[in-house]
């Protein structure tokens, strides 16, 4: 009886040990909990690219990420200077139960695939115009720069996600006309836009930009994701709405 009791004790001890061991890695994203937020996004992308599933915990500690516990994930976090916390199954289940409570304004979104990212940016861009590529580069998230030639040759089909920022799809040469139209860089930018439109077979920049906007619209209709910011948000819709109107 004593031997059986001892065996039972050992089994229970092992089960408790297994249930409390580390099984997940949490990347906290609140301001005070994460020392490098951009690199944390990069770790998440890297994990997805390695075929790990990641849970995005919306509204939980700044939108934290929950990854499987693996030696290579811990090592990569340490190399990139990303704050991480090691959680047991029990602790993880407690967090997920709290998030799923109807009384909480939180949600768990499972991420399964690393998207192929394209950034729409001109070849002759100015450094201050391209914070997006600077951020992605620092975060170590891979991306491809594309512009009108690539869009019009249907290369958007190669990507899952398209990012737009400083672009005037109406063909009016951007919002800087009022203050910078006499500066050398703006004059060169305008000349480059006109030369590209002519090269692609269009008489006017506005016609060429409308064709680009239509290709992007079709990309979104076909299931592609687009994130637009700055002048791209308004000018994209205006260009499509103004088709047939010389603005």
What are these regions (language model features)?
Residues 1-8:
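Bacterial N-terminal signal peptides that target proteins for export
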Residues 25-35, 65-75, 125-233, 237-239:
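Helical hinge/lid and interdomain linker segments adjacent to catalytic or ligand-binding clefts
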Residues 239-246:
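Oxidoreductase and adenylate-handling cofactor-binding alpha/beta cores
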């Amino acid at each position: 009886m004593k031997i059986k009791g001892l065996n039972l004790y050992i089994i229970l001890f092992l089960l408790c040990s297994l249930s409390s061991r580390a099984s997940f890695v949490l990347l906290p994203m609140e301001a005070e909990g994460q020392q490098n937020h951009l690199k944390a996004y990069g770790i998440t992308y890297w994990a997805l690219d390695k075929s790990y599933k990641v849970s995005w915990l919306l509204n939980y500690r700044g939108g934290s990420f929950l990854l499987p516990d693996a030696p290579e994930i811990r090592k990569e976090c340490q190399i990139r200077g990303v704050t991480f916390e090691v959680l047991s199954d029990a602790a993880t289940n407690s967090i997920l139960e709290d998030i799923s409570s109807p009384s909480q304004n939180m949600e768990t979104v499972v991420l399964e695939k690393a998207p192929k990212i394209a950034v729409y940016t001109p070849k002759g861009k100015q450094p201050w115009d391209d914070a997006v590529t600077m951020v992605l580069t620092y975060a170590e998230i891979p991306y491809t720069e594309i512009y009108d030639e690539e869009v019009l040759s249907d290369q958007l089909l190669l990507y899952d996600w398209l990012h737009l920022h400083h672009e005037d799809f109406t063909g009016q040469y951007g919002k800087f006309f009022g203050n910078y139209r006499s500066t050398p860089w703006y004059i060169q930018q305008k000349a480059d836009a006109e030369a590209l439109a002519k090269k692609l077979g269009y008489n006017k920049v506005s016609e060429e930009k409308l064709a680009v906007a239509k290709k992007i619209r079709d990309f979104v209709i076909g299931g592609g994701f687009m994130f637009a910011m700055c002048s791209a948000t308004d000018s994209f819709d205006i260009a499509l709405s103004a088709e047939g109107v010389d603005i």
